Every structure is written in C-alpha cells, then in structure tokens.
Amino acid sequence: MSILEVKNLSHGFGDRAIFEDVSFRLLKGEHIGLVGANGEGKSTFMSIVTGKMLPDEGKVEWSKYVTAGYLDQHSVLAERQSVRDVLRTAFDELFKAEARINDLYMEMAEDGADVDALMEEVGELQDRLESRDFYTLDAKIDEVARALGVMDFGMDTDVTSLSGGQRTKVLLAKLLLEKPDILLLDEPTNYLDAEHIDWLKRYLQNYENAFVLISHDIPFLNDVINIVYHVENQQLTRYSGDYYQFQEVYAMKKSQLEAAYERQQKEIADLKDFVARNKARVATRNMAMSRQKKLDKMDIIELQSEKPKPSFDFKPARTPGRFIFQTKNLQIGYDLPLTKPLNLTFERNQKVAIIGANGIGKTTLLKSLLGIISPIAGEVERGDYLELGYFEQEVEGGNRQTPLEAVWNAFPALNQAEVRAALARCGLTTKHIESQIQVLSGGEQAKVRFCLLMNRENNVLVLDEPTNHLDVDAKDELKRALKEYRGSILMVCHDPDFYEGWIDQIWDFNNLT
C-alpha cells in the first residue's frame, strides 16, 4: 500500500516546464533515491510533496496518520534557544504526555474524582512514554548529536550564532530524533564530515521506515537506497535496485532506443525513397500508396536532446609575486578567536585544500585572508599583482536578476550572443539563462557564479565548498578544469574524492585551533 502517492503532476516556472503529467508512489519501508541533473526539478518535487509549493496540476495524497519529516535548510530557528532546546523539541508530544500525567495526578486529589478512570489514562500515557524510551531521551539526544558532530560546537550554544553548516546539522539531528514514517532528505551530506557521513549511512541502511533522498554523493546514495526515481525531461521514471544498477539499466534502455531509432530512420528513408520513385507510375502507384499509408501510421521514435554538459575553463592572469598570502600570528573570528596564532604561507602555483570539521572557521579564514573581515589579532600580508577570484559557499537568496542580466552587468563589453555562449558553456540552457536566479536550483546558481569567475582573468582562485549542489557531470568537469588551471588555488572542500590526486598540500584546520 502506498503511503505517499503523486498523480498526474504538472508544474513549471513561467514557460519553463519542470514536470509534465508525472506519477510517483512510495511504499512502506522503501528507500528511494531521487536522481537527475541540476535543474531537473528534484528539490521542486520535494517542495510540492511537502506542501511548501502548490503544483499547477495533479494531486499529492498522503495516507492517514503518516508522519513526515523534511530536512529544510531554510527553516527558521527560534531565537534564544540552545542547541539542546531545539533537539528536545523533537519529543514535544512526549513532553505533553508527561505534563498530562502530572495534571491527572492533580485531578486525583480532588473530591469526587474517578480515580480508576484517571489511573487508566495515566497507565496508557505511561506505556507510551516507556515505549518511546522517554526516560533516556537525553542519552538518545547526546548519541545523535555526537554522531553528527553537533557536540563539536556545544549543546548550550545559542542557535542564532550557528553557521549554515552547523544549523543544518542541528536540523538533521532533530529530524532523525523525530523518526517519522517518511524522511525527506535534500543533500543531507553537504555539511557533514567523513565520519558523520559514515554514521548517517549506517543509520539510513538500518532505517525501518521509508525515505526519499536527494544526494550528489553517489557512493553514499548507492549504499542506502533500493529504489531510484530518475527525473529527466519533465518525467519521473521508477527503477528497482541501487544507483549503480539504475545506471546499467538506464544505459541499456538508452542504447536500445538509439538502435531502434536508427532502424526506424533507415526504414523511413527507404519508404520515402520508394514512394518518390513509384508514385507517378501507374503500375506501381498502388504499392507507393500502401507504403505512404505505412509511413503515415508509423509511431515515430523520438530521441531526447542531450542535456548540455558544462565546460569550465578558468583564465590565468599575469604571474603574481612568489608569496600569495603570508600570515603573522593571525587569529581569526568575530567576538572570540577561533584559532591559535597562525603563521601560514601560501605561494604562487600552489594548490591547497583546507579540510576540517564544519563550523570551526574555514570560511572565516578565507574571508580574513581576502580582507573581507578583519582579524582579531595579527596580520595578513598579500602578495603583489594578485588577481583574485572568489567563489562563496553561501549567497543571499531573492536574486531577481536572470543569469543573462547578472553576467552582462558584470561584463558590459560583451554582446548578448557572447554572454549567452558563456552561460551555455557552463551547462545552462536558454530556459535557465532567461529565468530569475532565485528560481534556479542550487547547482544552476553555482554554474552562474562559475561563469562570472571564468570570464575574469585570475591568478588565484579562492573556492569555498565549490562542489556543493553540483551534479556528477559538473563535479567531474570542475575537477578537470581546476587540475589544468595554471594558477594558485586555495580551496575549502569536504570531498576527498574531488581533490585527491591534484592538490599539492592539505591544511587540516583541526590542527590550527
């Protein structure tokens, strides 16, 4: 029996169709991977099934009494709450039951109280609390918080002071503690370190309820799912098995369709040739008409146009001085120092990856080196002739510009055709280029920012988690481009598969604090 069913769903933004008459079902206990290229509509689908967005057409039907939890990285956390306070809200229902028990005991003390009936209700509530391990909740909260790295930044920390990555960890921990019938997870590993990803993988493998997962971390995705829904060309197609099995079946179906297309095209050409040669001759006119009828009744096989794949190419600028950045007793932070005094040297043509737990100051270090924020103590010496290109991890939402406008405003000397060509090289279609940036997916928005970076000459690239939100093709192409780039790279990255093999040096931020 389906616990979630989507029927005849159609949706779009303006004249850009996202889904066209698609259906979807989720059965109890299924572990579904929702896969597809950037911009195909995966996050939009999640927003529709959770009711955050209304579809243009179609129905979303949930079974009665089913609970669902959605990892929404834009959720608002109440001010003046500690991390522990937020995690304890996962059990609000149980705390209400405890309060009700206390009220019932108060009622028993009143004259004329039906003690037997009140005790029966107390017993039912007590059974519910014990079945949910209510009296060991704090231990359970600590277990999940430790496993996801939440304890690294403190359970008593005010949530309003958290970084984006820390905030996402808290939301994920709260969601897992709630243990709903259906988990809806959109890129849950984006801000997790390797050890936390391993724990989440084991957790999801053993999760007895259902979940729908979006992730561009293919090894992680493959290890936890048993059903794939592929989003492509406004359609949703269901496949049984893990991601690698889906790839095999998809490639085989694509190959079979292409072979059938080629055979049909040859048959069409032969039929048209026969009709053209024989329709005018009396002796063969009937045969020509028969062939024409066959042509007219033929169901034409259509191949979907290939999705544009990005082609990244970062232009080097003139050669800088030997030293890019040198720090002297640098301490970074906002109110309190996040690091011990740092004496770092970053030289010309080095390619360095900065790794370490989320929320401990890697982004703050980049911004301090660039002069975006002032250090608490010490100094940063920047080299001569620097042409810096900076890719930020987080950008503010609500950008009503189109990619065409954003790039053209940044490079007014280009004509419209050149701007469109530059965006197309980053894997964006005409529909993407003419849509507002705020309605694009995270991966598409990243491609717009890469386009801005590519059209400047830089001799230093400073990149903060550049692979977040990128699909497999875009990530592979970015890796190739950075490997071939003839300049210096300083990059924060949590994905060893991305940087291993071409990075010269690793700065482990855990050793700098």
What spans do the regions from the language model cover?
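ABC ATP-binding cassette signature C-motif
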Residues: M1-A259, P308, A317-T513
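Intracellular alpha-helical coupling/juxtamembrane segments of multi-pass membrane proteins
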Residues: V249-Q304
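Post-kinase regulatory C-tail/linker adjacent to protein kinase catalytic domains
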Residues: F312-F314
